[in-house]
Amino acid sequence: MSCQQNQQQCQPPPKCPPKCPPKCPPKCRPQCPAPCPPPVSSCCGPSSGGCCGSSSGGCCSSGGGGCCLSHHRPRLFHRHRHQSPDCCECEPSGGSGCCHSSGDCC
């Protein structure tokens, strides 16, 4: 009997529960930052062939080194071209691949 009582006394004390974390002071809700303005770009989207205006150098963003022709309405019977007729691709072997002031390829 006394031995069992001694064993109970020798047992480690039960672990204390962790301390409660300090309560955070109430904070004001952070205000949402102002939405970013839409990117200013003179390039059209992929739906229009990715052709850029002369203000951005006349390069075609989707054609890779292409140039913009004069902005006219694409004709419907130009079905054999994959991109908009407003955009022409400069061949890599065709010199510097620059664009004329009119937007045509050099």
From Swiss-Prot:
Domain of life: Eukaryota
Keywords: Keratinization
Compositionally skewed regions (Pro residues) per UniProt: 11-25
Free-text tissue specificity from the UniProt record: Skin-specific. Expression was readily detected in adult trunk skin, adult arm skin, fetal skin, penal skin, vulva, esophagus and tongue. Not expressed in the cervix, rectum, lung, colon, or placenta.
Induction (free text): By calcium and UVB.
Start and end residues of each stretch annotated as Disordered: 1-25
InterPro entries associated with the record: LCE
Biased composition (Low complexity): 1-10
GO terms (BP aspect): keratinization
Miscellaneous section: Belongs to the LCE cluster present on 1q21.
Family statement drawn from the similarity comment of this UniProt entry: Belongs to the LCE family.
Function of the molecule: Precursors of the cornified envelope of the stratum corneum.
Subunit comment: Interacts with CYSRT1.
Protein name: Late cornified envelope protein 2A
Protein's organism: Homo sapiens (Human)
